[in-house]
């Protein structure tokens, strides 16, 4: 399942390519056809993310609520007038591109970003956000949603309810509502006897945080994953600020890098990490390998159905 930075990055790309434009909306697969017809020919005002949830706000005051789940993908691809490949639940392209003129395509930087894929386990799959398709500077693009957990049409009031179910999002650090949620999360943290590793994965506490950021933040701060929430709350601001920093980097660069400069491949004269997830990390999916800081073996356990990684020496 993609972590929150992937969804925020996707929202940014959708706004860059389609924001403020009149859109053609369809459901080639057919499962969203009736809803698509209600927003076809209307303006996409904005795409915005909260945690792992994506909201596409149309001028008709109707909102498409998307959650990719474990296998969903939302790709920005070259526009083609015939039916796109695969089981496309939702298809978007600019109305002006039906004539093939003046399309706004991805920037070179965005094209070079390539596919962003995340996986919750070591198996193949995951969620892709952006295809590394070769495009000319004025080639039309489309957005195609495949295999989501949710794709539904909701009202503004229903969107507010959905956001109200979520916790604080580290990628919305200055949002007034999010700041209120953050303070409430901190209050709940001080009363919780659950482990901090469990709380970090709870979307009602930390919206958008997934398995990778959970493991890496706890390592970077030297916190034992079994530490109770009420104990870890003494370091709540450190946890929050590290999440803000790491997830903002992930949103900007399209990959998760968590190692500090002194532990980079160049500084340590070691080979770069080779993993489908990409990026340099301390413990995630490094079970049995030497810790980059102390040299002891990275540990692994399945906790609440999810893989947890930590260094028993650095995280006492």
Predicted ranges, named:
Residues 1-62, 89-98, 105-111, 117-118, ...:
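Extended, highly charged segments
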Residues 22-35, 127, 132, 185-316:
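Basic, nucleic-acid-binding surfaces and adjacent catalytic neighborhoods in DNA/RNA-processing proteins
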